[in-house]
């Protein structure tokens, strides 16, 4: 060969197409440089190491052996290579990719050699990535790398291709360029089965022949370096139609009130169930639920809610403008010194006093909660309480009302502030209208006013002395009023406040020949009437001392007196509720605890007043109070669950109470222990309520006997003529229809001349039985209506013991009984002289007269013996302490010690059975307002034993009086050294000191009473 070309290979990282420049040389030079020398074993190892670790391996010539020259003819078509490149690019996953191509695919043809020779390894530089040692033919190839930038046209037509060889098989081949070999080579490259290749290509200008040398890599990993892309891959965006944004409150509201799917229960029942289980505290509809429970909104008129709420808000705005008037901001001029009631300045100054009291209470409202320290919230609460005080003129504002307002405004502010309309472009909905924070104050006032409809009577103030005097004067006028035979008159005891706390009412029906005295012992603790939660409680029974509808009113009565009487009756409601909880419910559910508290003389109103008026706001944590209110409001029926929740609270601490005395019991009740889960108390209260069904059912099914007699009535023997009884029987029975408040039933028995009057049912409220989820509410008769026959001894519903009653038969009665009344009700008629004892000298007396056959107050007392008289004098007081107020201590111990002599019925005398009674039993009778009174006189005042006992009591009292100062000093010393002594020792000393004081006071009072008796 004359000429041959040197292969110049451009191995640059930046380009993939080699630039080849041909140079003229001899064939001997080419053959000698490639095939002359065969390396030895040592040289092969050195060459391999040098090829791996050396940097000049690409430029150093390889030692090769001489082989016969082989004609080389290998070329590729540029057009086919471009088509193959396009097919390779189409294999890439179809994703929207923006690519900036900077490099092109380098493809080479595979040259195949027919000779197999020993191999050695070398590594080309700057062409392979992550490759292992290269297996090459041990031929020394001298490659001169020269680059000529001038041959650009020739460079574009020649491209490299990657050569795929089998691993560990060195092949050096020179083949002719044909289409079949090119297609196979490209397919192998596309399948990823090729490794990195080092390609050398040379062309012969004269013969237009080209050859290539391929070197395979011994690599197990597959690498594709055919293309290099620079750019960003854009992810496909799938546009989804988003649903309109709805707040959780809106979603919950629509789910309950506007559900397209029929619900298993009604919306109100769902809310009530959530309230009892505790799920309501997590609901955003708690405020609406309270308003529904209290009757602020009608659940059956959801479509009218927007109109009703608008009216409530407008009403509050009107009241606020009317009562929150400031004459300083008015354009008109008013006299600030005017005392006229219509004067704006006079109203303004009165309002300032009320507002000052309100603000003082608000400063003490939950001081540990920062929410109530906010000036905006305080101003809002002050305005609400002031507007309510002006709309409720009788009660106005009372301390404790702010405690009821605090949870309401806290809840409403929390819900109104958290609600936010997510989609401002959407139309306004009912939820958007309700939860408008602009009307937070308006809606808070609306629900607070609804709550006060059930609790306002509990805040009625105690009647003043002027009220008592006016009532007494009215009672006097009523007693002196002349009535027809069919009319009725009433009178009260001297103290309205004391009587109101013990009894509900008493009435009498009188005629010219008959008289009736009615009293109800069980009515002292009457339960409230069950009714729907949306209606206010019915009007209370007429107060003591007020005129009944059938009594002729006095000419001096006025509207102001009626308001005072109404206020007095409201004040009694909460006291009666306390007594009902203690004496009825607690006794039924836990008699042991009731008996223990009763023995400690702990009045129920001492602690129950705070529990009831504040709805347990100070006994539990603030969040627990909200949970308790959920259940109270959801149960409805005039918040009757309060009664049973009180019993649940007492039974929760019963073990502490049973082991403690009066001091520790009060401490435990006043400082109620923390409760981990208040729903346990709620569940217990519901169980107590449901367990009353059997008791109430027994009362409901009780049938009245033939002869009317009750534990709350008084049977008094009356020797009237048969003709008079027959004439007045119809008149007395007609009063039952006219007097609806008293329900006086007068049944005159002609055979035995008995006059019996059952307890009034109107004054005794029905016993609650049904639960909230029952469809109808049954009304049950009170305990006082449990009527028994004359032959059966009635059972006292409070003590479950036989109750003594005065009865009269044709024969001598061995068990005449009597129950006391709190007021003396009698007709205005004359009576003959009666006998009394010193015990009865200062008490109202009922005197029985054979001639006139009626009872009247005794004008004076007599010292004659009762056994020698035909009259019976019965002292009537509201409690046992008042009855024995003027008696001596010795009389108390010997009151029932002497047996009585039976009195013949012909002389209108009474025989008292079971005359012996202990002081403990007397205390129990005091609580129950029912006791047995003696018919025998007291021990003679001239007895020597009585004088000695008097002197002993006086001396003992004087000695205790001298000892008390030293005991007080010891108490102060112990309190000053609390660190050295144990708390139990100090408490024991204090208890002993208190008992000594009580004994000294009793002896001192007896000494004063003895002196008063001696003066009389």
UniProtKB/Swiss-Prot annotation:
GO BP terms? adenylate cyclase-inhibiting G protein-coupled receptor signaling pathway; negative regulation of asexual reproduction; regulation of sorocarp development; response to caffeine; retrograde transport, endosome to Golgi
- Output the Gene3D superfamilies linked to this UniProt entry: putative rabgap domain of human tbc1 domain family member 14 like domains (1.10.8.270), Ypt/Rab-GAP domain of gyp1p, domain 3 (1.10.472.80)
Looking at the keywords, is Nucleotide-binding present?
no
Identify the residues that the record assigns to the Rab-GAP TBC domain, covering every copy.
280-636
This protein's record includes keyword Hydrolase:
no
The molecular function terms of the Gene Ontology recorded here are: GTPase activator activity
Which SMART domains does UniProt cross-reference here?
A: TBC
**Polar residues biased stretches:** 12-23, 704-717, 790-806
Under the heading InterPro entries, the entry gives:
Rab-GAP-TBC_dom, Rab-GAP_TBC_sf
Biased region (Low complexity) positions are 79-88, 467-525, 545-558, 718-755, 766-789, 807-872
The ranges of region (Disordered) come to 1-23, 60-109, 179-209, 463-566, 704-872
* Task of the protein: May act as a GTPase-activating protein for Rab family protein(s).
Q: What is this protein called?
A: TBC1 domain family member 5 homolog B
Instruction: Specify the species.
Output: Dictyostelium discoideum
């Amino acid at each position: 060969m004359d000429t041959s070309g040197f292969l110049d290979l451009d191995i640059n990282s930046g380009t993939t197409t080699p630039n080849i420049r041909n140079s003229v040389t001899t064939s001997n030079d080419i053959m000698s440089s490639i095939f002359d020398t065969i390396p030895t074993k040592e040289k092969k190892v050195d060459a391999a190491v040098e090829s791996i670790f050396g940097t000049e391996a690409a430029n150093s010539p390889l030692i090769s052996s001489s082989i016969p020259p082989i004609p080389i003819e290998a070329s590729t078509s540029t057009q086919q290579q471009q088509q193959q490149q396009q097919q390779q690019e189409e294999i890439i996953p179809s994703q929207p990719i923006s690519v900036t191509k900077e490099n092109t695919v380098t493809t080479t043809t595979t040259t195949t050699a027919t000779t197999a020779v020993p191999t050695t390894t070398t590594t080309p530089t700057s062409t392979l990535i992550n490759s292992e040692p290269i297996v090459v033919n041990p031929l020394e190839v001298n490659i001169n790398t020269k680059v000529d930038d001038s041959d650009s046209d020739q460079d574009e037509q020649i491209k490299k291709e990657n050569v795929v060889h089998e691993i560990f098989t060195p092949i050096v081949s020179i083949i002719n360029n044909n289409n079949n070999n090119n297609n196979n080579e490209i397919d192998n490259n596309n399948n990823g089965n090729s490794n990195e290749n080092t390609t050398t290509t040379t062309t012969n200008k004269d013969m237009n022949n080209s050859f290539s040398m391929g070197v395979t890599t011994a690599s197990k990993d597959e690498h594709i370096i055919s293309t290099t892309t620079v750019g960003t891959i854009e992810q496909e965006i799938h546009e989804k139609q988003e649903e309109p944004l709805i707040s959780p409150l809106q979603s919950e509201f629509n789910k309950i009130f506007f559900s397209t799917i029929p619900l298993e229960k009604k919306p109100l029942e769902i809310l009530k169930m959530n309230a009892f289980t505790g799920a309501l505290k997590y609901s955003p509809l708690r405020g609406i639920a309270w308003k529904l429970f209290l009757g602020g909104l009608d659940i059956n008129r959801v479509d009218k809610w927007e109109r009703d709420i608008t009216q409530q808000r407008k009403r509050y705005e009107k009241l606020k403008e009317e009562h929150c008037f400031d004459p300083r901001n008015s354009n008109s001029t008013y006299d600030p010194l005017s005392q006229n009631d219509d004067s704006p300045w006079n109203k303004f100054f009165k309002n300032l006093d009320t507002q000052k009291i309100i603000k003082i209470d608000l400063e003490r409202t939950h001081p540990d909660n920062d929410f109530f320290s906010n000036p905006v919230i305080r101003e809002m609460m002050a305005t609400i309480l002031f507007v309510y005080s002006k709309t409720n003129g009788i009660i106005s504002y009372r301390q404790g009302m702010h405690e009821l307002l605090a949870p309401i405004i806290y809840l409403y502010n929390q819900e109104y502030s958290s609600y936010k309309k997510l989609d401002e472009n959407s139309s306004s909905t009912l939820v958007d209208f309700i939860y408008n924070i602009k009307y937070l104050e308006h809606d808070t006032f609306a629900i607070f006013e609804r709550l006060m409809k059930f609790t306002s009577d509990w805040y009625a103030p105690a009647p003043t002395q002027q009220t008592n005097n006016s009532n007494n004067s009215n009672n006097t006028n009523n007693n002196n009023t002349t009535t027809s035979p069919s009319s009725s008159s009433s009178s009260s005891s001297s103290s309205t406040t004391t009587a109101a706390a013990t009894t509900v009412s008493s009435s009498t029906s009188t005629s010219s020949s008959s008289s009736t005295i009615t009293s109800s012992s069980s009515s002292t603790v009457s339960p409230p009437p069950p009714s729907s939660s949306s209606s206010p409680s019915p009007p209370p029974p007429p107060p003591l001392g007020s005129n009944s509808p059938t009594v002729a009113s006095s000419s001096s009565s006025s509207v102001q007196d009626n308001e005072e009487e109404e206020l007095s009756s409201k004040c009694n409601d909460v006291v009666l509720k306390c007594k009902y909880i203690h004496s009825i419910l607690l006794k039924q559910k836990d008699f042991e605890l009731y008996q223990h508290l009763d023995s400690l003389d702990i009045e129920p109103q001492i602690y129950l007043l705070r529990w009831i008026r504040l709805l347990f706001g100070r006994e539990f944590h603030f969040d627990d109070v909200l949970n308790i209110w959920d259940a109270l409001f959801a149960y409805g029926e005039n918040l009757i669950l309060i009664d049973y929740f009180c019993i649940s609270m007492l039974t929760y601490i019963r073990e502490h109470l049973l082991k403690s005395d009066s001091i520790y019991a009060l401490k435990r009740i006043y400082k109620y222990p923390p409760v981990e889960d208040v729903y346990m108390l709620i569940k217990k209260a519901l169980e107590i309520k449901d367990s009353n069904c059997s008791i109430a059912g027994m009362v409901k099914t009780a049938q009245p006997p033939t002869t009317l007699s009750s534990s709350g009535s008084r049977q008094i023997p009356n020797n009237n003529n048969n003709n008079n009884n027959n004439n007045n029987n119809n008149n007395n029975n007609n009063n039952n229809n006219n007097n609806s408040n008293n329900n006086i039933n007068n049944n005159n028995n002609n055979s035995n001349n008995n006059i019996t009057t059952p307890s009034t049912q109107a004054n005794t409220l029905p016993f609650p039985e049904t639960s909230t989820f029952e469809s109808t509410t049954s009304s049950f008769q009170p305990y006082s209506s449990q009527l028994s026959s004359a032959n059966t001894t009635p059972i006292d519903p409070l003590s479950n013991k036989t109750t003594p009653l005065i009865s009269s038969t044709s024969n001598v009665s061995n068990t005449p009984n009597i129950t006391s009344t709190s007021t003396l009700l009698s007709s205005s008629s004359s009576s003959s002289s009666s006998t009394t004892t010193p015990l009865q000298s200062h008490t109202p007396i009922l005197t029985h007269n054979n001639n006139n056959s009626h009872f009247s107050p005794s004008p004076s007392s007599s010292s004659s013996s009762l056994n020698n008289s035909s009259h019976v004098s019965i002292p009537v007081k509201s409690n046992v302490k008042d009855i024995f107020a003027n008696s001596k201590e010795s009389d108390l111990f010997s009151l029932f010690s002497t047996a009585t002599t039976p009195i013949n019925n012909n002389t209108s005398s009474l025989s008292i059975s079971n005359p012996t009674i202990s002081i403990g039993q007397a205390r129990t009778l005091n609580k129950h307002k029912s006791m047995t009174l003696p018919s025998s006189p007291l021990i003679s005042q001239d007895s020597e034993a009585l004088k000695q006992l008097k002197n002993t009591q006086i001396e003992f009292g004087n000695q205790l009086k001298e000892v008390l100062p030293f005991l007080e000093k010891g108490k102060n010393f112990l309190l000053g050294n609390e660190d050295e002594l144990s708390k139990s020792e100090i408490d024991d000393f204090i208890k002993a000191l208190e008992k000594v004081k009580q004994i000294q006071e009793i002896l001192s009072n007896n000494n004063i009473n003895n002196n008063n008796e001696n003066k009389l």
